Amino acid sequence: MTGCASGKQETAAPEAAQTESPAAEETTAEPEQTEEVPAEEEAPKAPETVSFTDSLGRTVELPADITRIAPSGAVATMILAAIAPECMVTINAAPSESQMAFLPANLAALPETGQMYGSKANLNLETLLAADPQVVIDLGDKKGDMTEDLDALQEQIGIPVIFIEADLPHMAAAFRTLGGLLSGKADRGEALAALVDRTTTMAEENAAKITDDMRVRVMYTTGEDGLGTNAAGSMQAQVLDMVGVENAVVVEDVSNKGGGNIISLEQLYNFDPDVILFADGSIYSTVTDDSAWSQLTAISTGKYYEVPGSPYNWLSGPPSMNMILGVWWLGNLIYPEIYDYDMQTMTQELYKTLWGYELSSEEVTALLGNSTLKAAAQ
């Protein structure tokens, strides 16, 4: 990856002009008249700042050459780590050892600043200021009184703060915007945007082929007891909507938080989905031994799977660029005759594009062992 390493582009010094000495003149020749050559005009200096209008309509003055950036939280960390990890001067939380197996090495040493939004909002301003970023970047979905929040933070720290909308429908545009803002990142931004465009186009075309009688009712669960659910309409369940399954969990007050809506066992029995997706770290491995779960259709028929979770959960947690993996994975898992491709090969391609990481066959097997490979063996 290029860009952000130095923050300044060097320009080669102009070559000295080559002149030829005129042949010697006879002493009787009249003196040669010379013309005054005007001094070269200095090239105009590049602007030090540019005006940027963010996704909230806020106009913010930014450095023209951005090489030091700070994410506002988990979603921003994931996206910025994909496009410009070497530009990051902070991280929301230190990646685990298992995550670092796939992520750029420099992320492990970055100071942690927490996050601006969410149930665990704990932005550490002292650490943020000490890292001396040129701009704080918030990415994700629009929520609450963001304009007031970002204006207040910007005034408090004296550093530009911007928001770029980056939910699944806006993610390609977000990568292109970042590619234009960050020094030397236009090509990288376009490569990531092209992958998002390819993914969403593929999903839209395939989802259109799914008729109502083919619709599979899917439930996506989280938490140690499996009763945290990402309901229909939730930001955390965007992949289900895009792929074309029916989200089996329908509630009145939809939560967009990471844990989703907590439901009761009675509600679980009423929903009784065709397929259950367990987030990594949930009860996938013990669910068949639990009488409260074993009577469910998905469990009794073996149609339950674990969502791959390295370096991040492929469906959400947080809902960010990891959803690109989730679209390819879930479509192929539920409708393999429509989303018709080799998911093992696709996984290797996606990790290479997103993280620059070459997955081995053994690593692919470990990632897909409780989902794609399990389904293929059924």
Where on the chain are the PLM-derived regions?
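Extracytoplasmic substrate-binding proteins
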Residues: 49-52, 59-61, 148-228, 308-371, ...
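Structural recognition of the beta-strand scaffold that forms the well-ordered cores
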Residues: 70-72, 89-92, 135-139, 160-165, ...
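Low-complexity, Pro/Thr/Ser/Glu-rich flexible segments characteristic
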Residues: 8-47
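Alpha-helical, coiled-coil/dimerization segments enriched in small aliphatic residues
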Residues: 117, 229-259
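Short helix-initiation/N-cap motifs at beta->coil->alpha
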Residues: 55-57, 113-126, 253-265
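A contiguous binding-surface segment within folded domains or other stable secondary-structure elements
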Residues: 131, 250-306
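A short, structured surface patch at a secondary-structure boundary
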Residues: 76-131, 135-143, 245-248
